[in-house]
């Protein structure tokens, strides 16, 4: 994969995981909640992607999905699409609902490769099992990981180093997939009353390749205007703390990344703006539509027309 696409994918999709999982509110943990929201992604003032988030949950179960497509210059340089989903149930940690993921799936495609990963969780031990598949878009044939362009270009030393960086099984136990992790983080924020006082949280994550923690803090509610619309928001500032599975450069890059998410300070608690900064980019993602109110805003054709 082209280096630009890999950087865009790492930064933008990582941020979108947060939006996908944090969208619904649980002011009342027993209240069923559904959301369908559309977002636009901007980097350097350029429109580079669109996303649609779906989530449905009640006191027993949750299902969440995310579809993202490259737009504008990003689409011209390297077409990219991703489709992610997570589902599971809930247990309780004190008075806070804690997600228990059952299945996490991540599909993506670029100009050369189509890839799919499915991660499942043992309901008793919570041990994860992962299956991955790569297909060449040119030939339609399945590829091994060693045949992937970005792996083939690595030196023997780099491949040996990657093999040693595999996350040990015991480090995966008790972790959440990225989408379930942000659901857990949002529950902690709401349970601790972020509208009244600052809240801190830390959630363990395994994404199928890397093990890290999401660490966040909130600030007091304030009024902001975004695209001529005024919101009363709570700010959640996040950092990612690497634990296992990283190269030296990858660990440094993750430590340097900073995220900020603005949530409406109401019962829905939905994100209206996300910003992310690292050594490669500074990007922003804005809420463009509530698809339950404006369904056409979330169709691929309408998003493509808006991008042109």
Model-based region annotation:
Residues 28-125, 178-308:
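Acidic, serine/threonine-rich low-complexity disordered tracts
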Residues 8-9, 38, 105, 135, ...:
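Small/flexible residues
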Residues 22-27:
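Sec/Tat signal peptide C-region and signal peptidase I cleavage site
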Residues 155-175:
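Surface-exposed beta-loop interaction hotspot
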Residues 1-15:
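Bacterial N-terminal signal peptides that target proteins for export
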Residues 130-136, 165, 300-308:
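Short, surface-exposed secondary-structure junctions/capping segments
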């Amino acid at each position: 994969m082209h280096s630009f696409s890999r950087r865009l994918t790492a930064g933008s999709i990582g941020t979108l995981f947060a939006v996908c999982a944090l969208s619904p509110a649980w002011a009342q943990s027993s209240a069923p909640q559904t959301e369908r929201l559309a977002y636009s992604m901007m980097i350097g003032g350029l429109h580079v992607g669109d996303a649609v988030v779906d989530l449905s949950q009640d006191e027993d179960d949750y299902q969440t999905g995310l579809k993202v497509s490259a737009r504008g210059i990003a689409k011209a340089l390297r077409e990219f699409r991703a489709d992610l989903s997570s589902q599971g149930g809930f247990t309780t940690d004190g008075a806070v609902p804690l997600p228990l993921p059952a299945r996490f799936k991540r599909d993506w495609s670029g100009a050369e490769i189509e890839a799919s990963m499915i991660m499942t969780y043992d309901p008793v031990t919570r041990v994860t099992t992962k299956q991955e598949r790569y297909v060449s878009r040119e030939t339609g044939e399945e590829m091994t990981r060693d045949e992937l362009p970005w792996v083939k270009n690595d030196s023997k030393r780099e491949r040996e180093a990657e093999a040693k960086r595999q996350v040990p099984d015991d480090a995966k136990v008790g972790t959440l997939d990225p989408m379930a992790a942000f659901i857990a983080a949002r529950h902690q924020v709401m349970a601790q009353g972020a509208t009244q006082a600052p809240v801190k949280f830390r959630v363990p994550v395994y994404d199928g390749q890397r093990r890290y923690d999401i660490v966040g803090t909130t600030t007091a509610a304030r009024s902001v205007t975004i695209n001529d619309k005024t919101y009363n928001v709570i700010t959640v500032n996040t950092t990612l703390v690497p634990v296992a599975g990283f190269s030296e450069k990858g660990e440094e890059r993750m430590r340097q990344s900073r995220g900020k998410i603005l949530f409406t300070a109401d019962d829905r608690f939905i994100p209206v703006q996300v910003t992310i900064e690292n050594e490669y980019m500074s990007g922003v993602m804005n809420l463009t539509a509530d698809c339950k109110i404006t369904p056409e805003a979330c169709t691929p054709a309408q998003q493509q027309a808006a991008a042109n």
